[in-house]
Structure formats: C-alpha cells, structure tokens
Design a protein with these regions (language model features):
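Transmembrane helix interruption/hinge and helix-loop junction motifs
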Residues: 9-18, 129, 145-149, 227-231
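Hydrophobic alpha-helical bundle architecture
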Residues: 141-151, 164-231
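Transmembrane alpha-helix boundary signature
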Residues: 8-19, 34-41, 56-67, 169-172
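Alpha-helical transmembrane segments in multi-pass membrane proteins
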Residues: 1-6, 17-21, 25, 29, ...
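Long hydrophobic alpha-helical segments that form multi-pass transmembrane helix bundles
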Residues: 37-135
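Structural signature of hydrophobic alpha-helical transmembrane segments
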Residues: 11-21, 118, 122-132, 176-189
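Generic transmembrane alpha-helix motif of multi-pass integral membrane proteins
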Residues: 2-10, 136-142, 191-197
Length: 231
C-alpha cells in the first residue's frame, strides 16, 4: 500500500492530504478488521476514495502538472518547464454532451493524443497510471513470480471492454462514445487491473470467482466512468 498510494495520486498532491487519507485508510479499512491479512477493502483504494471525496478539487483531473521536456528523447516540444492541463478523462468530463461523436483528447499544447501516446505514457495523469507499457512490464513480473492471477487481470480487461462496447452502442454522451481501447489505456484502469484487482487479500480466491470478480470490477469501472459526471 505504501508504494501503490503515491502511484495513484496526482504528482502535485500536498503531502499532508496523502498522510491524512493514508491514516484514515489504515485505521478504518485495515486495523478495524484485524490488521494485515484480514482487511476486506484494499487500503490503497480506500485512500484514493477518501482523497476523491474529501478533496475533490485536487483529485478531479481537471488540472494536473504536466512536464513538457522530452524523456529519453521521447515526447519533446518543451516551451516551459511545466504547466497544468486537464487529463484526457478530465477533458471527457468537461466536454459533457456537447461534442458527441467528434471528441478528441488533446495534450496541453493542443495536439491530438494518439493511442501510442497513451501506451507509452506521454499523457498527463497520476504517476502510475499513464504508461500502459510500464504497467504491462509490472504485470509480467507479478505473473512470473506467481503473486497475481492472470485470470483476474484478463477478466478485468474483458469486463471493461464489453461494458464500453455496450455504452458505445448507446452513445448518448461523450463518455459513452469513448472507444474500448481508449477506456483500457486511459486513467487508472490498466493500473487497477494489474495491481489493485489482484490484491491477494481482498480479491477472489476460487478459480471461477476470479473470472467473475475480475469481470465485475472492469464492468463497474466503465459504468462509473460513463454515468458518473464526477469520475
């Protein structure tokens, strides 16, 4: 939890907010149930939920710090050291119902964000959520060491893809029109599927349960994105 929590919050989140949220989660989501191995809620997720509801302005994704210098020669175009801008999902929320069928997420300089940008992590967002490539490397390590179950991981992605396809067919809002691939690449979906849903304490333990649990996690994540204006 101590490693995951910094990975799922914006880089400019005040440290005192993280400290308060972490203390709340450890006490009320872990210790009250008996401590390590007995908690029924993921401590890192409870921390993130506490931050979202207690300090929504800092967690909404409307404005986050964005670095404009290149990283190992990738993603250049520096004009200033950094400035704030909306995350792609933040742009979806801001767009509302005005641009149905024509929405295109852009970076802080106004350039369209490509699928390749999402995969490499050249988009604004929390530290651990932007690079799908890095998340996949982490997934390989977890699977190789047998810490996590591939059944849970795959089921989360399948559940998310199926639900996003259903919303695509409905297509009454911008959030519903986001493609399944974009849904899986944007925000914390991939990070959650790999590092959160596979938590050995709070995730399903039966083989059949892993499929059902993962599918429901992925489907619920997309439902919240598409129907909750404050995601």
């Amino acid at each position: 939890s101590g490693i995951l929590i910094p990975m799922i919050v914006p880089v400019d989140t005040p440290l005192w907010m993280i400290a308060v949220a972490t203390a709340f989660a450890v006490v009320f989501a872990k210790e009250v149930f008996g401590g390590t191995g007995y908690n029924v809620f993921n401590v890192a997720l409870v921390t993130r939920a506490f931050l979202f509801f207690a300090y929504p302005a800092a967690m909404s994704g409307d404005q986050v710090f964005v670095r404009t210098a290149d990283t190992f020669g990738i993603g250049g175009g520096q004009v200033v050291d950094g400035f704030s801008g909306a995350t792609p999902l933040g742009q979806v929320a801001i767009a509302g119902k005005e641009l149905i069928g024509s929405f295109q997420a852009v970076d802080v300089l106004g350039h369209p964000i490509s699928t390749w940008d999402m995969f490499l992590g050249l988009i604004p967002g929390s530290i651990g959520e932007t690079s799908v490539l890095a998340i996949l490397i982490g997934a390989v390590i977890l699977l190789f060491t047998k810490i996590a179950s591939w059944k849970t991981m795959v089921s989360v992605f399948v559940g998310g893809a199926v639900m996003s396809l259903i919303f695509n067919m409905i297509g009454t809002t911008v959030a519903m029109c986001v493609s399944p691939l974009d849904h899986l690449f944007l925000g914390g979906f991939a990070f959650g599927a790999v590092f959160m849903a596979t938590d050995p304490v709070t995730s399903a333990r039966t083989e059949t349960g892993k499929y059902i649990y993962g599918f429901l996690v992925g489907a619920m994540a997309i439902i919240i994105r598409a129907l909750n204006p404050g995601y």
